[in-house]
UniProtKB/Swiss-Prot annotation:
Catalytic activity: Hydrolysis of proteins to small peptides in the presence of ATP and magnesium. alpha-casein is the usual test substrate. In the absence of ATP, only oligopeptides shorter than five residues are hydrolyzed (such as succinyl-Leu-Tyr-|-NHMec, and Leu-Tyr-Leu-|-Tyr-Trp, in which cleavage of the -Tyr-|-Leu- and -Tyr-|-Trp bonds also occurs)
Keyword Phosphoprotein: no
Catalytic site positions: 98 (nucleophile), 123
CDD domains for this protein: S14_ClpP_2
Main location: cytoplasm
Pfam families: CLP_protease
The name this protein goes by in its record: ATP-dependent Clp protease proteolytic subunit 1
Organism of this sequence: Bacillus cereus (strain ATCC 14579 / DSM 31 / CCUG 7414 / JCM 2152 / NBRC 15305 / NCIMB 9373 / NCTC 2599 / NRRL B-3711)
One biological process term in Gene Ontology: protein quality control for misfolded or incompletely synthesized proteins
Assembly and oligomerization: Fourteen ClpP subunits assemble into 2 heptameric rings which stack back to back to give a disk-like structure with a central cavity, resembling the structure of eukaryotic proteasomes.
Length: 193
């Protein structure tokens, strides 16, 4: 059962009721709290564009608790983060894995955070192929290119040598918040706002 809480605010005109996500959006907070798919990506992209239109100078806060998901959906979010003018601060609360971790490390430099008990995981892209041998070969080439591109991105954003990133992402590579800070995925582990 998915229950979305509502909050009530007093205004000059009386009471106003918001679902919690709309209320957080007023404070420029976007939450990714699920697997990243096309629907989640469309919602996050729309929120990023809306907040840029509202005020292109103020930071946007992206809170992440996600096991990852679709690379194409994830890149839609990541490319929009890079496209818009406001800095996007990222915060891992709980778990940022796979593309969730890529979004976390793609926040504005100096503004990437994790809560103390967060866990971060990077790995190579997952995929499958079926059909004729030629189709399988095409898919294999695509996923190998994607693996290289993602490793390069992680290396650039963290300052780690690409050889280390390639080695670490061969399998699921789990990190605590402090280990993610040492790796360069986040800039700080926060305990207070």
């Amino acid at each position: 059962m998915n229950t979305i809480p509502y909050v009530v605010e007093q205004t000059k005109l009386g009471e106003r009721s918001y679902d919690i996500y709309s209320r957080l959006l007023k404070d420029r907070i976007i939450i990714i709290g699920s697997e990243i798919n096309d629907q989640v990506a469309s919602s996050v992209v729309a929120q990023l564009l809306f907040l840029e239109a509202e005020d292109a100078e103020k930071d946007i806060y992206l809170y992440i608790n996600s096991p990852g998901g679709s690379t194409t959906a994830g890149f839609a979010i990541l490319d929009t983060m890079n496209l818009i003018k406001p800095d996007v601060q990222t915060l891992c609360m709980g778990f940022a894995a796979s593309f969730g971790a890529l979004l976390l490390l793609s926040g504005a430099k100096g503004k990437r955070f994790a809560l103390p008990n967060s866990e971060i995981m990077i790995h190579q892209p997952l995929g499958g192929a079926q059909g004729q041998a030629t189709e399988i070969e095409i898919t294999a080439k695509r996923i190998l290119k994607l693996k290289h591109d993602i490793n390069k991105m992680i290396a650039e954003k963290t300052g780690q040598p690409i050889e280390r990133v390639a080695h670490d992402t061969e399998r699921d590579y789990f990190m605590t918040a402090e280990e993610a800070k040492a790796y360069g995925i986040v800039d700080d582990v926060v305990t207070k706002k």
